[in-house]
């Protein structure tokens, strides 16, 4: 496994599991299942999987979640490009911890904004990000269509079509660090 042992490691003990959040340095192929869980389009994943940096949540030696952070090279804005937690570990705060760690890293790099895009139909994920302090920024219509490489699906009966962009201001904001009230990834 390609987890960096030299990276800053944060450990949390929660619900009888000890989690470590670390920067991943291995082959992104090792994380294919998580990338597929985060995005319904294998073609889309292929275009961005190699970009940026990836944080992983580990329970022992097992990767249970990831967050891909893109942007850099002097840019003021970073983007959460991909975030997923194994289905059997969702709801335990793993996604929140990954976002908190990414936001902290962005603050240390003096970035002002953290962006994320998600499906407008996925109200559970929209709630998750808003509980962390992200705010609605804009809607990208027809981003998830067969023409853009996505299957025709519905989330909780809502057709998957539009992408919603959310932003989190990082200058002096601490919303991402506050305890979540449910809806955790």
Segments predicted by a language model, with ranges:
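Conserved N-terminal entry element of GNAT/NAT acetyltransferase domains
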Residues: 2-26, 164, 170-181, 185
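Acetyl-CoA-dependent GNAT
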Residues: 19-88, 96-100, 140, 169
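Short, P/G- and charge-enriched loop/turn segments at secondary-structure junctions
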Residues: 42-44, 150-157
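Active-site acidic-Proline motif in GNAT/NAT acetyltransferases
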Residues: 86-88, 92, 120-121
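A conserved short alpha-helix in the GNAT/GCN5 acetyltransferase fold that borders
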Residues: 90, 99-107, 130
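Conserved GNAT acetyl-CoA-binding A-motif
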Residues: 106-118
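Conserved beta-strand-loop-alpha-helix junction that forms the acyl-donor binding cleft
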Residues: 116-126, 137, 141-147
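Conserved active-site tyrosine of GNAT-family acetyltransferases
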Residues: 128-129, 134
């Amino acid at each position: 496994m390609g987890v960096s042992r030299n990276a800053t490691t944060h450990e949390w003990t929660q619900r009888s599991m000890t989690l470590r959040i670390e920067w991943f340095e291995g082959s992104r192929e090792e994380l294919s299942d998580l990338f597929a869980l985060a995005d319904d389009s294998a073609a889309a994943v292929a275009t961005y999987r190699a970009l940026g940096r990836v944080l992983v949540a580990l329970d022992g030696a097992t990767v249970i979640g990831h967050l891909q952070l893109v942007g850099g090279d002097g840019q003021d804005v970073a983007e959460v490009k991909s975030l997923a937690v194994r289905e059997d570990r969702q709801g335990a705060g793993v996604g929140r911890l990954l976002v908190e760690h990414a936001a902290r890293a962005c603050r240390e790099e003096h970035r002002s904004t953290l962006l994320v895009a998600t499906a407008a139909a996925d109200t559970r994920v929209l709630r998750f990000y808003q509980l962390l302090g992200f705010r609605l920024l804009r809607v990208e219509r027809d981003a998830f269509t067969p023409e853009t490489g996505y299957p025709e699906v519905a989330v909780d009966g809502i057709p998957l079509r539009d992408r919603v962009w959310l932003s989190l201001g990082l200058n002096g904001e601490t919303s991402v660090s506050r305890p979540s009230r449910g809806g955790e990834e």
